[in-house]
Amino acid sequence: MNQIVFTAWVLLFPAACTTLGAAGVFLLRRRSRPCTQRILCGMAAGIMLAASVWSLLLPAIQRGQTLPLPAWIPSAVGLVLGAVGLLQVEQFAGQLLAGGAGHGGRMVLAVTLHNLPEGMVAGLAAALALTGEPDAISGALALSLGIGLQNIPEGAAVSLSLIHISEP
């Protein structure tokens, strides 16, 4: 496969999946029922929680087993630091958007901050795959597929929430 086509696929597939999920808002009525919105938000949260636990937290605990302290401590410290960092970003965003952007502006900022590291990781995986090593190529494809599948319900939940916020 051409390197440019491969890199474009790895980078654009997650974005296309987000767009696909967000396009679901056009299939529903202008103002979705609260039940539909709760189901989609719950599904997106469940997928993100599962991805966090099984793809990040458990592998981090496994890698921590080589350290001289209990394996869960580095992961717990990282989890707490991440939560504190998120609270700091939340406070900063509140001050930044206090001028009237409201909930919609906060949501757009949150989605941007969330997708930035995803794009960076996909780009790094694509760059590593260009070395030609089979593990790097399959890893980049799997990462792109995993991020993309997570982005479908995420895009739906965000678009439905933005529609709900924007209407009186």
State where each predicted segment sits:
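Interfacial loop-to-helix junctions that mark the boundaries of transmembrane helices
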Residues: 2-9, 33-40, 63-76
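Residue-level detector of conserved catalytic or cofactor/ligand-binding positions
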Residues: 163-168
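Membrane-interface helix termini and inter-helical loops of multi-pass transporters
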Residues: 57-68, 131-132
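Alpha-helical transmembrane segments in multi-pass membrane proteins
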Residues: 9-17, 21, 25, 42, ...
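C-terminal ends of transmembrane helices
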Residues: 21-34, 86-98, 155-162
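Helix-boundary and loop/linker segments of multi-pass membrane transporters
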Residues: 1, 97-101, 131-136
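Generic transmembrane alpha-helix signature in multi-pass membrane proteins
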Residues: 24, 105-148, 152-162
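Cytoplasmic-side transmembrane-helix entry/capping segments in multi-pass membrane proteins
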Residues: 35-44, 100-105
